[in-house]
Amino acid sequence: MSSVDLASYIRTIPDFPKPGILFRDINPMLRSPEAVAEVIRLLSLVCERTRPDLIVGIESRGFIVGAPLAHQCGLGFVPVRKPGKLPGDVVGIDYSLEYGSDRLEIQADALVGQPRVLVVDDLLATGGTAAATAQLVTQAGGELVGFAFVIELKGLGGRTVLPKDLSVDSLLAYD
């Protein structure tokens, strides 16, 4: 049982980034060494269960959580980024958003040898970015073993678009 109440470090900001959105801000949590340590401790339990070879973090807050998690678990870290941010050859995927489209990329040689991959991000909302990352990991040669998020917005149904046979873990859930 944890003595750190992670939910108390999440600030709710109405109408950001646009009217009608209730934004869950992790920045107060990031300012607390105790809260960050607890997040990494809890996510490391997901690593123990899923046994990945690498952590893949989604730009940009997935880097903030994913890199220290990889370090804690003795694993490598691979960033998934927006287009044009990674040097060298990349593998990319285009995906649809609620109002438009976007693209994610990973270095072409990042997942050589079919490593087992845990995808990490700060937030699961509609699941579009996580689902695209799952496809990208597979396309780049990785074996996806699961997803881990700090926060899940359950009312947006993100789990429903992720592969059903994989572990999906979140530390905090909001309706």
Curated annotation (Swiss-Prot):
Pathway annotation: Purine metabolism; AMP biosynthesis via salvage pathway; AMP from adenine: step 1/1
Reaction(s) catalysed (UniProt annotation): AMP + diphosphate = 5-phospho-alpha-D-ribose 1-diphosphate + adenine
Swiss-Prot/TrEMBL GO biological process terms: adenine salvage; AMP salvage; purine ribonucleoside salvage
GO molecular function annotations of the record: adenine binding; adenine phosphoribosyltransferase activity; AMP binding
Sorted UniProt keywords: Cytoplasm, Glycosyltransferase, Purine salvage, Transferase
Gene3D superfamilies named among the record's database cross-references: 3.40.50.2020
Enzyme class: transferase
Subcellular location: Cytoplasm
InterPro entries linked: Ade_phspho_trans, PRibTrfase_dom, PRTase-like, UPRTase/APRTase
Documented EC number(s): 2.4.2.7
GO CC list: cytoplasm
Coiled-coil features, chain-numbered ranges: none
Protein family according to the UniProt entry: Belongs to the purine/pyrimidine phosphoribosyltransferase family.
Record note on quaternary structure: Homodimer.
HAMAP family linked: Aden_phosphoribosyltr
Function summary: Catalyzes a salvage reaction resulting in the formation of AMP, that is energically less costly than de novo synthesis.
Protein name (Swiss-Prot/TrEMBL): Adenine phosphoribosyltransferase
Source organism: Synechococcus sp. (strain CC9902)
